[in-house]
From Swiss-Prot:
Function, as annotated: Plasmid partition require REP1, REP2, and a cis-acting DNA sequence (known as STB). REP1 may act by intercalating in the yeast nuclear matrix and binding STB either directly or via REP2.
Originating gene: B
Residue ranges, compositional bias (Basic and acidic residues): 167-178
Keywords: Plasmid, Plasmid partition
Record-given protein name: Trans-acting factor B
Residue stretches of biased makeup (Polar residues): 72-97, 110-166
Region described as Disordered: 35-188
Coiled-coil parts of chain: none
Biological process annotations from GO: plasmid partitioning
Length: 322
């Protein structure tokens, strides 16, 4: 609702991917009035922050805050690409063909002298023209007769490799089976529809949700993610569930607090710092101007620690999607 204070002076929680309990406490306390914000999140002395420009989603937000979250420009890294390899079957088959040709040549060279001696002893001297043809010709004739057996051997090698790979797959399959079993057990541990709504009503009746209720909220969130039927009924009842607990569960399921990118740079005069934040399922907050204190104007300063809090006015529905 307009005028609701959104406190981002605990942005270190986002940068460090904090624990679930702290995130729940954050969503619980961020719904408090702006007058009680300082008691919940005490800040240092506020410094001047100029009005920010409109963000990329088109909603006109004004930011007012006080510099102290660790700022560091994010850099994207690409995973190295592995070169494609020749399939083992093709390599084995080509090697088998080379070996078969060499073996056929060797056997032909061994058999040709024997055939020549046999023909010379049984025939007349003038029958030399009917003897075994030259070595090259006999080699070319014997190669086709030797190839089928060698090719069968190659096929046996390939089939044995396939069998060994299948055995390795069967050995690894218990791990995947165990993982799927754990997922099934986790789904079974989730609440059914009746238990879910009973637990939800018990939390809804509480005037204040504390850290002691974090396990129950975790169970509700896990149930919403695992059971699509309950999730659909939860969305259909959103008109009657527009209270603090509904907002907390919806935010925890959608995980909007996940910070996708953040960056900042000094202005040309070096007196201000321009910061931009991009969250999951939320538009980008850009153009946040922070006045730098004199101690940060030194050239040797690389990282600047600050806390920034701002109030969003002219609230509009956040329809940006990643």
């Amino acid at each position: 609702m307009p005028g609701t204070a959104v406190h981002f002076n605990e942005l270190e929680l986002f940068f460090r991917q904090t624990r679930f309990a702290e995130l729940v406490q954050y969503f619980v306390e961020m719904d408090d009035d702006s007058d009680d914000a300082e008691a919940v999140f005490p800040t240092s002395e506020p410094s001047r922050v100029s009005e920010g420009s409109e963000n990329e989603s088109g909603s006109g937000e004004e930011y007012e805050g006080a510099p102290h979250v660790h700022f560091q420009e994010s850099t994207a890294t690409e995973e190295p690409r592995t070169p494609s390899k020749t399939p083992a079957s093709q390599t084995t088959q080509s090697i088998g063909r080379t070996v078969s040709i060499a073996e056929a040549t060797r056997r032909a060279s061994q058999e040709s002298p024997r055939q020549t001696e046999t023909a010379g002893s049984s025939s007349a001297p003038d029958a030399l023209s009917t003897q075994q043809p030259p070595l090259e010709h006999s080699t070319q004739q014997n190669i086709p007769t030797k190839l089928p057996s060698t090719q069968q051997a190659v096929e046996r090698v390939v089939s044995s490799q396939t069998t060994s790979r299948a055995a390795e797959t069967r050995e690894r399959s218990p791990e995947h089976t165990e993982a799927s079993t754990q997922e099934a057990e986790t789904a079974e541990e989730a609440l059914n529809k009746e238990e879910f709504w009973n637990l939800y009503r018990s939390l809804e009746s509480k005037s204040y949700i504390s850290r002691e209720n974090v396990p129950d909220i975790r169970l509700l969130v896990m149930c919403l993610k695992a059971n699509l039927e309950i999730q659909g009924e939860f969305d259909r009842r959103r008109v009657g569930l527009k209270n603090r607990l509904y907002i907390i569960l919806k935010d925890l399921v959608e995980e909007p607090w996940e910070l996708r990118a953040y960056r900042g740079c000094r202005s040309a005069d070096g007196l201000t710092l321009s910061v931009s934040f991009k969250y999951k399922n939320r538009p980008q907050f850009s153009g946040v101007k922070v006045d730098l204190e004199p101690k940060f104007l030194q050239e040797s300063v690389v990282n600047i620690y600050y806390t920034i809090s701002f109030t969003v006015r002219n609230v509009r529905p956040l329809t940006h999607s990643v």
